[in-house]
Amino acid sequence: QTCASRCPRPCNAGLCCSIYGYCGSGNAYCGAGNCRCQCRG
């Protein structure tokens, strides 16, 4: 699921949008420096 053009809330609940434009969970998507939007606080 791509998300870069649909920020700020592009992904399903519980997922983050990575700087590479994909939704996912974990540090690769949600971590500092990796997350573009809809990041976990």
UniProtKB/Swiss-Prot annotation:
<feature type="disulfide bond">
    <location>
        <begin position="11"/>
        <end position="23"/>
    </location>
</feature>
<protein>
    <recommendedName>
        <fullName>Antifungal peptide 1</fullName>
    </recommendedName>
</protein>
<comment type="subunit">
    <text>Monomer.</text>
</comment>
<feature type="domain" description="Chitin-binding type-1">
    <location>
        <begin position="4"/>
        <end position="41"/>
    </location>
</feature>
<keyword id="KW-0295">Fungicide</keyword>
<feature type="modified residue" description="Pyrrolidone carboxylic acid">
    <location>
        <position position="1"/>
    </location>
</feature>
<feature type="disulfide bond">
    <location>
        <begin position="7"/>
        <end position="37"/>
    </location>
</feature>
<dbReference type="GO" id="GO:0008061">
    <property type="term" value="F:chitin binding"/>
</dbReference>
<dbReference type="InterPro" id="IPR036861">
    <property type="entry name" value="Endochitinase-like_sf"/>
</dbReference>
<dbReference type="InterPro" id="IPR018371">
    <property type="entry name" value="Chitin-binding_1_CS"/>
</dbReference>
<keyword id="KW-0147">Chitin-binding</keyword>
<keyword id="KW-1015">Disulfide bond</keyword>
<dbReference type="GO" id="GO:0031640">
    <property type="term" value="P:killing of cells of another organism"/>
</dbReference>
<keyword id="KW-0611">Plant defense</keyword>
<feature type="disulfide bond">
    <location>
        <begin position="35"/>
        <end position="39"/>
    </location>
</feature>
<feature type="disulfide bond">
    <location>
        <begin position="3"/>
        <end position="17"/>
    </location>
</feature>
<dbReference type="GO" id="GO:0050832">
    <property type="term" value="P:defense response to fungus"/>
</dbReference>
<feature type="disulfide bond">
    <location>
        <begin position="16"/>
        <end position="30"/>
    </location>
</feature>
<keyword id="KW-0929">Antimicrobial</keyword>
<dbReference type="InterPro" id="IPR001002">
    <property type="entry name" value="Chitin-bd_1"/>
</dbReference>
<comment type="function">
    <text>Has antifungal activity against P.infestans, A.lycopersici, V.dahliae, G.zeae, A.nicotianae, F.moniliforme, F.oxysporum and C.gossypii.</text>
</comment>
<keyword id="KW-0873">Pyrrolidone carboxylic acid</keyword>
